[in-house]
Amino acid sequence: MIDFGNFYSLIAKNHLSHWLETLPAQIASWQREQQHGLFKQWSNAVEFLPEIKPYRLDLLHSVTAESEEPLSAGQIKRIETLMRNLMPWRKGPFSLYGVNIDTEWRSDWKWDRVLPHLSDLTGRTILDVGCGSGYHMWRMIGAGAHLAVGIDPTQLFLCQFEAVRKLLGNDQRAHLLPLGIEQLPALKAFDTVFSMGVLYHRRSPLEHLWQLKDQLVNEGELVLETLIIDGDENTVLVPGDRYAQMRNVYFIPSALALKNWLKKCGFVDIRIADVSVTTTEEQRRTEWMVTESLSDFLDPHDPGKTVEGYPAPKRAVLIARKP
């Protein structure tokens, strides 16, 4: 069973202590009532993983752990089998004692695009909204963050995160909670808040921006990464039934429209840091994620369009400050 006690003990001693007024009851309710039917199977995979203290740990350039002496073929096979029980792996990659988890997304490429535009993360307390398996949280720690807290209600991601954490020597500098942002009080406690790949899934994108702002300290930094389309400050795509085969895509603004949304929500110093077309090299099927991926969602005769005829995925990173 996944235990959140270490996190409670950690925040009891810092400026997040007021979160303890609501968080333990929320987690207890989730443990009683909301667990996925496969959660026991996934958590067993985590439990059966060996506890290893890495001799070499690299979170700055990748998420890589190595032992002083190479593991035996049997040990490597055991780790690989247990990690495969947690498929599909969408966000990564991870290199753990000779087991290379080639995830659907090259999340390291996104991090390389984002990192040069961030304020120095050294010593910061960070919230990662919709953090997936937690890959970017480990990279935040590698960049000097004091604490990275991720929230994501997808329970497979929680188990993937806990599996990686165990293989990183039970590292307590990052924590994942199975919650959505709407379940968080206005903590106003994080130096940097990341929301990457979330906004277009929200029925009310401006409400999401307000929720992000409510988590930031004054002068805190928002890092927003989302789908965009080309156009002026009034351009917003509202897809029909699906976009790139996803049903839960509601609003895709232009980067300029998104700047206006952020301004309307009270953010300042707003800048478009990066715009990139998503390629089939960055998002693709692998042996760790064997179902459909981006190439299946694009028009086979025109890769500049989705199968529905919309512009193919393009993403922007915007940076803003809460005054």
Curated annotation (Swiss-Prot):
Keyword Protein transport listed: no
Q: Which GO terms describe its molecular function?
A: methyltransferase activity; transferase activity, transferring alkyl or aryl (other than methyl) groups
Stated EC number for the protein is 2.5.1.-
Q: Which Gene3D superfamilies does UniProt cross-reference here?
A: Vaccinia Virus protein VP39
Instruction: Set out the biological process GO terms recorded for this chain's protein.
Output: tRNA wobble uridine modification
Q: Which chemical reaction does it catalyze?
A: carboxy-S-adenosyl-L-methionine + 5-hydroxyuridine(34) in tRNA = 5-carboxymethoxyuridine(34) in tRNA + S-adenosyl-L-homocysteine + H(+)
Give yes or no: UniProt keyword tRNA processing.
yes
- A Pfam family the protein falls into: Methyltransf_9
> According to the UniProt record, which cysteines are disulfide-bonded?
none
CDD domains assigned = AdoMet_MTases
Q: Which UniProt keywords apply?
A: Transferase, tRNA processing
Q: Which NCBIfam families match?
A: PRK15068.1, tRNA 5-methoxyuridine(34)/uridine 5-oxyacetic acid(34) synthase CmoB
Q: What does this protein do?
A: Catalyzes carboxymethyl transfer from carboxy-S-adenosyl-L-methionine (Cx-SAM) to 5-hydroxyuridine (ho5U) to form 5-carboxymethoxyuridine (cmo5U) at position 34 in tRNAs.
Kindly state the subunit structure of this protein.
Homotetramer.
The record's section on HAMAP family has: tRNA_carboxymethyltr_CmoB
Descriptive protein name: tRNA U34 carboxymethyltransferase
Organism of provenance: Escherichia fergusonii (strain ATCC 35469 / DSM 13698 / CCUG 18766 / IAM 14443 / JCM 21226 / LMG 7866 / NBRC 102419 / NCTC 12128 / CDC 0568-73)
